[in-house]
């Protein structure tokens, strides 16, 4: 298992060793799409070989010998903080500070013995770093899921396919269109004609070309 500090590092690890399989978040039911990851994926030369949907549940954790009255600051990833806005609104005296990662926030508090600090992370991360769970399930929306993509070097796709338990029933594409009237509608009409279900469409601006876009679709 290779832990990466950024999504860029995930693709770098796959590029460095073609036997390495990468996993990265692409979409959350509350926060929406991670747009930057779409572009990283397009530039990487890797291929999507699967996906995994994970139920997200956040916990409020602190050092083992501290309690609610000791907490003055909470650290976590910006998206996790956003997903717990209702809970944080009930504790206005606690200062909210953004961090790089949910689990990393808990790890830093534990290793550096940051008294008065709490982290928002998973219960598994709390157990791993010996943190005390003050409250579980603090996310605002209990139907909180993140979709992860599994990516690999194109040379590994056939080998991985042999170990798949079911048929491939999903594909992702990226394309650009001429900046003319009805160009996107024509593409969607083709998908409709062949009874292909479009599950997602996302537009991103093309850097250096004003008001022109590329489209990412899942079918």
Language-model segments: which ranges?
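Domain-level signature for soluble enzymes in the chorismate/prephenate branch of the shikimate pathway
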Residues: 1-219
């Amino acid at each position: 298992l290779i832990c990466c500090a950024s999504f860029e590092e995930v693709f770098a690890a796959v590029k460095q060793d073609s036997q390495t399989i990468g996993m990265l978040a692409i979409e959350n039911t509350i926060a929406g799409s991670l747009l930057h990851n779409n572009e990283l994926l397009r530039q990487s030369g890797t291929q999507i070989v699967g996906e995994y949907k994970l139920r997200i549940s956040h916990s409020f954790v602190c050092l083992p010998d501290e309690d609610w009255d000791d907490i003055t600051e909470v650290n976590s990833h910006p998206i996790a903080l956003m997903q717990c806005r209702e809970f944080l609104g009930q504790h206005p005296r606690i200062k909210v500070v953004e961090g790089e990662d949910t689990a990393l926030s808990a790890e830093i508090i534990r290793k550096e013995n940051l008294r008065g600090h709490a982290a928002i992370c998973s219960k598994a991360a709390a157990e791993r770093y010996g943190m005390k769970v003050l409250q579980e399930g603090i996310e605002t929306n209990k139907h909180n899921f993140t979709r992860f993509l599994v990516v690999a070097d194109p040379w590994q796709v056939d080998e991985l396919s042999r170990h798949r338990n079911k048929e491939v029933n999903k594909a992702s594409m990226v394309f650009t269109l001429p900046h003319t009237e009805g160009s996107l509608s024509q593409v969607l009409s083709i998908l409709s004609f062949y009874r292909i279900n479009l599950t997602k469409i996302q537009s991103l601006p093309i850097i250096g070309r004003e008001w022109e876009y590329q489209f990412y679709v899942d079918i």
